């Protein structure tokens, strides 16, 4: 039955309105555009998969260790350490503002007895007593407050690295003192810091004060090995060419301007608030099993003050590179299990797309020099109770990660009404204490943040920082860049599909199994699938064409086309015969596929992997084989038909996507069997395989080669009632050989009889198949 629908999708054509084609082109067309790099280049959206070689373009990063530079005289900028690297010079540095501060640094070699030496300081000859009875070098800091006073010995730095430092900050001059590796900083105050000039007699480096910890590290432990090679040649300070412009936190600076365009630099502080979202899906049955617990994208809107201006911001938080965990407490229906739950760890990334209504986000299309600096934040997991029908509840608790800023690019953020050009901030992760565990299970001591309760009661997580960018905008501020309408239309459709998927998944428990079996036996075709939609015949024809076009681009349709070749007579009604028959046109191609599988069996050592690969190909054989029983696609189509009839969100726009998606995702865990005399061989897509006798259900050794030969020559049967269910049914109720053969062949009459008798084992199996019909 379902194969008839799929054949119609592959072969039939229907009339369609031209307006439908135009809408499709407008919403789905993509084109390759080559941008000529010049003064202005359009930035790309952020990548979905991150690679180790990824770098941020047009981002200027201030070096931690800038140099070395040749000896010179200059007025050093404030908030930059001058790291002095002498060789054997006696006078290292002289600095003064000629009003209230004169500082000189003298270098004394190891093992020097008390003696008087002559130095030339600020053009004057001075006799200064020095002594160094250690094996390290000593820096003597000489100081005076007025031009007529004598120099006094103020501080000493004893160093085995032979490095010293000098800094102008706030209203003081800072230097190092003490003994390495525990040297610290100290200061001398002045009323005129800006006029302090220096004469540096040695090679030196420049380090920003924001990296002061690095400067302290170099003073105490030495320069990196690379800086100590003979290939490092000092250059003149003029090569640095630094413009010391102290930008405000929030300001717009016009970089350049022509008659039509101008470059605008935007500097903004920023407060990012975000939260995680998750999806918790529970399996059917007795209520002891969960299907999946995963992260979902989460939107958050909020207001905050920026320099007295009220800003409305919108963020979208998503994750990449999740780790899949699972827990299985046993095979019984009352054993607690979670098939899959997601955890983010060190190999994961968190994306936060940020947009606000300020001027900075207008016309954000052509952007360069995009940079940001953000704080880190710790995200901790809370508790989640697995509410079991009976017994003590397992409790998931703990887990934490820290988010560290790792880059920023442009992105597009979709809201309910418009798509917005926004900034995507990327965060790398480190795991933190405490680890997570599941109480009353053996899961404990694992690190990362699981998707169970990632917000832990917090309304949001908050990160503060700032960003800057240079944007090409029209000279006339009244112009704005339009948003592509087709992008918004397509996003609206995606949102409708999301609502429809949630509704479809929630309808699974409302389907009566007896009606499902009856519906699965009906000769459904394309038009009968549309009965739940109130529309005209013309609309139905147009909709059928849309479904057909979607399906032809799917992976399943491509596989079927390759397998079956021409199916020109597929639109005609195919009646079921009393015996199993195969589509002749598929035999030769399937034989080729089987030979490929058999040929690969020697190279693949894992039998389970072989069975999984073979079972996934068996679905193609299932679609091209008609039997007197049911197959998985009969159930899939019946469930789809029932949900379409009950749905309130279905429409001609969403049905094509839903039908195509259901053909791929409904009942992903399929099992197939072949029957030879009194022996049944069964395999599923997870790689599990069985061989057993029909009379006793006693397992026998599984012969892979025999199985490959059988699937080439014999019909493939959908294992609606799998081996585990058959054995359970026989052990608890006892079944005859005739009943066993009927269940093995998935005879719908026998299935209906068992369901009408309210047999719990058969009912539970059919319920599980219905619950697997998820999008």
From Swiss-Prot:
InterPro entries, A to Z: ConA-like_dom_sf (IPR013320), Rota_A_VP4 (IPR042546), Rota_VP4_MID (IPR035330), Rota_VP4_MID_sf (IPR038017), VP4_concanavalin-like (IPR000416), VP4_helical (IPR035329)
Residue window of motif DGE motif: 307-309
Disulfide linkage: 317-379
Region Spike head, residue ranges: 65-223
Residue span of motif YGL motif: 447-449
Transmembrane segments annotated in the record for this chain: none
Superkingdom: Viruses
Entry coiled-coil feature ranges: 483-515
Key word Transmembrane present: no
Pfam families membership: Rota_VP4_MID, VP4_haemagglut, VP4_helical
One Gene Ontology term, aspect cellular component: host cytoskeleton
More details: This strain probably does not use sialic acid to attach to the host cell.
Entry's family note: Belongs to the rotavirus VP4 family.
Name of the featured protein: Outer capsid protein VP4
Organism: Rotavirus A (strain RVA/Human/Venezuela/M37/1982/G1P2A[6])
